Amino acid sequence: MSLKNRYRETIRPKLLKDLGFSNLHQVPKVVKINVNRGLGEAAQNSKALEASLSEVSTITGQKALVTRAKKAIAGFKIRQGMPIGCAVTLRGERMYAFLERLINLALPRIRDFRGVSPKSFDGRGNFTLGVKEQLIFPEISFDKIDAIRGMDITIVTSARTDEEGRALLKEMGMPFRSN
C-alpha cells in the first residue's frame, strides 16, 4: 500500500482520534517537501552546478531549479544573480513517493544511523533534515558522482504545533531518535 493510501485509510483516522480533533480537515497532513542544496563552489565551478542539478533531479524525479544570490557578498566572492545552488519543491504523488523512499530506503542506508533528531521541528510543525551525502539514495551510484555533497530536506505540514507534526511523521514511519 502506498504512503498516500495508508495516510488516508489508517493514519488520518488514528490521528483524528489520538489528537482529539472533531473534523477530518483538522488532522495534519504533509503539504510539500522542499529539497535544497547550496553550492558554494558553483560561483567558480559551473560543472559542479550541472552535476548537482542532475543529481537532485534524479533523486526527486522532478527538474531542479537553480537558486541565485539575492545580493552580492564580497567575503564569499559572489555577485547578485550568480547561481549558488538548486532546489526542488515536491507536491502530490511525487511528494508521497519521495517521502516513502526517504523513510524506507535512504535513511536506513546512513552510516551509524540511530534515528533522526526529534528536535528538528521549527515550532510550527515543519520538519527539516540535513543529509550529509547523496549516496544514501539508491538512484545515485558511487561511480557517477564527482564529489560528495549534502542537501537539506524540509517536510512542510499543515500541523499547528510540533507535537502534531511529530505525531504525523511518526505514524508515517519516520524513525525518530529516542533521547
Swiss-Prot record:
Gene Ontology molecular function terms on file = rRNA binding; structural constituent of ribosome; tRNA binding
Alphabetical list of InterPro entries matching this protein = Ribosomal_uL5, Ribosomal_uL5_bac-type, Ribosomal_uL5_C, Ribosomal_uL5_CS, Ribosomal_uL5_dom_sf, Ribosomal_uL5_N
Give me the segments passing through the membrane: none
Which Pfam families does the record associate with it? Ribosomal_L5 (PF00281), Ribosomal_L5_C (PF00673)
List the record's Gene Ontology CC terms alphabetically: ribonucleoprotein complex; ribosome
Q: Which domain of life is it from?
A: Bacteria
Give me the disulphide-bonded residues: none
Some GO term, biological process aspect, for this entry: which one? translation
Ribosomal protein recorded as keyword: yes
Q: Which UniProt keywords apply?
A: Ribonucleoprotein, Ribosomal protein, RNA-binding, rRNA-binding, tRNA-binding
Quaternary organization = Part of the 50S ribosomal subunit; part of the 5S rRNA/L5/L18/L25 subcomplex. Contacts the 5S rRNA and the P site tRNA. Forms a bridge to the 30S subunit in the 70S ribosome.
Describe the function of this protein: This is one of the proteins that bind and probably mediate the attachment of the 5S RNA into the large ribosomal subunit, where it forms part of the central protuberance. In the 70S ribosome it contacts protein S13 of the 30S subunit (bridge B1b), connecting the 2 subunits; this bridge is implicated in subunit movement. Contacts the P site tRNA; the 5S rRNA and some of its associated proteins might help stabilize positioning of ribosome-bound tRNAs.
Similarity annotation = Belongs to the universal ribosomal protein uL5 family.
Entry protein name: Large ribosomal subunit protein uL5
State the organism's lineage: Bacteria, Bacillati, Cyanobacteriota, Cyanophyceae, Synechococcales
